[in-house]
Amino acid sequence: MSCSCFGASTVRQKRSDRQAHQPKQVEEGKHFTELLPGRRYEFVSISITFGAFAFWFFILHNNGALHAKTKNFSYNELRAATNNFHRSNKIGRGGFGTVYKGILRNGTEVAVKTLSAESKQGVREFLTEIDTISNVKHPNLVELLGCCVHGPNQILVYEYLENNSIDRALLGSKRSIKLDWKQRSVVCMGTARGLAYLHEELVPHIVHRDIKASNILLDKDFQPKIGDFGLAKLFPDDITHISTRIAGTTGYLAPEYVLGGQLTMKADVYSFGVLTLEVVSGKSSANINYGGGQKLLVEWAWELYEEGKLLDLVDPELEEFPEDEVLRYMKVALFCIQANASRRPAMSQVIQMLSKNVRLNEKELTSPGFFEDSGGASGKPSKHKSSETSTSHQMSSVPITITQVVAR
């Protein structure tokens, strides 16, 4: 059986509310099959049946509407395109599935993301991803081309982006591409524009919840596109925050979200700040060996900032770069990762700050927050810029201050 693909609908939020407890149920089911191995195939069969039912239920609630540019792919078509999902065509692994490169019969290159019916995300996140992006078009968002359901196989088909993801291009020991500063600045600015569109222009607004280097893909011209919307949450205009289960990637998670489950758009802003530090430094936020000790990237960046040595964070691979501009990008990142969520700028402000349209008021900058695996969040006051202790537990209403540059 193949699915139909469909545009955004007014029942998105209702569906999310209705299925809020599904992850727990799946976890329990998984545990049950481990206790009773003989029941495993029965459970898988139930999962497949439920998945099929959920798709058709969703279609009925959308009056069977199809988005004009999405396609209903057959399983055989995608299997042929990927050479039977051969490991040589594997190009990555997203938050909810393995991604393969495929070539359709007409020669079009595509990215084929396969999800298993046994995986913990189940139907909920699969439907979320389709529902979220099938009707969303922006130069800095990955385009969904279509989908397919065949037995236990849930498959999404995206446009193929030649230069893979930022983490493969920049982070780790096996860098595949050498990006100069101009290209890196384009990555940061393009990602900021994509997030600003999701947060402020789209209605209902969307919080991505999993902004990270592996979810920022590069096209043939090295323009960035945000992908992997499996964790996305919709925000109606009258909602300021959502209480939700914690989901995302360690190293990018805002402390107030980890500790309290309070999700706002400022969680994406925090993740963007971490991503920007990674792009400038060429170092992964997942490591904890920076600055000559057990430090996270955000800790090290703040330490260097306080010492007036922020340029020491810059990737040694960057042989030539405009120091003032690179410093600006790193300081904007520090504004984004402040422990106090209300002090972080909106993404539209971030775009202005990156583009030199505003002067950064560093007197308003307070220390970053970060979540440690040991179970705590930290936010240390600046040694010389502010006497205010700013932690994820103290939520101030003081907004970020930015001063317009006045032409002489």
How would you describe each model-predicted region?
Residues 1-68, 322-332, 339-408:
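Intrinsically disordered, low-complexity cytosolic regulatory tails
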Residues 151-159, 163, 167-168:
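A conserved loop-to-beta-strand element in the N-lobe of protein kinase catalytic cores
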Residues 88-99:
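Protein kinase glycine-rich loop
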Residues 146-147:
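A short, aromatic-enriched beta-strand patch in the conserved N-lobe beta-sheet
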Residues 126-131:
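Regulatory alphaC helix of protein kinase catalytic domains
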Residues 100-117:
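Glycine-rich ATP phosphate-binding loop
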Residues 268:
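Conserved catalytic-loop aspartate of Hanks-type protein kinases
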